[in-house]
Amino acid sequence: STPFDLKSVELLVRLGLKRLKLPSGEITNAPLLLKAASTGKPVILSTGMSTFEEVADALGVLAFGYLGDGRVPCVKAFKKAYASGAGRETLKGKVILLHCTTQYPACFRDVNLRAMDTLRSAFSLPAGLSDHTEGIAVPIAAIARGASVIEKHFTLDKLLPGPDHMASLEPDELKDMVMAIRNVEEALGSPVKKPADGEIENIAAVRKSLVASRPVRKGESFTGKNISVKRPAAGA
């Protein structure tokens, strides 16, 4: 669940949540980030509206909070925590970044899904997508690009008042999205290039072999005039 203030963090801890979701609007809220990290719980951090530098700064605050070495919190200490080996290792086990376009609904041209790849490679952290586009195409594409987490708003009726509902999925759509994602995950399969088990039985029928294109006399040489290539692969 998502806390928007310090007391909400405490409430979620008391409720026994295993992970905290920090929204895009709080990425510059250092006290909230510190409070979340001080619980020791893993966090999912949305990065909508953020620059690359702001994401790095937020990770510094989280690293400082997780390390909890008693130093006075300040920008210098945050940067030092993020630059330290201990800080980076702690973040790897605690933080997932979500690329996000904070727009309701988000336009496809503004999604910039490749930025999710940038977050993953630049910060060496798992990355996913908090999606506000209409439909389910973008979350499915994100999974194909290696997203670790998909966040999608859910509603019982898109016509309800408020900015979130029109960018949310109704029950049947959510079911379709999950099923499509599971299919894509299965289809991603292995990076090893080899025939799939289901292909083996088709090799003989689909590939071709050399066959005589006309009667060949004993002792006659094979040439392009008396042989051809045809299915199945049961000839020479």
State where each predicted segment sits.
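Catalytic cores and adjacent flexible loops of soluble metabolic enzymes
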Residues: 1-236
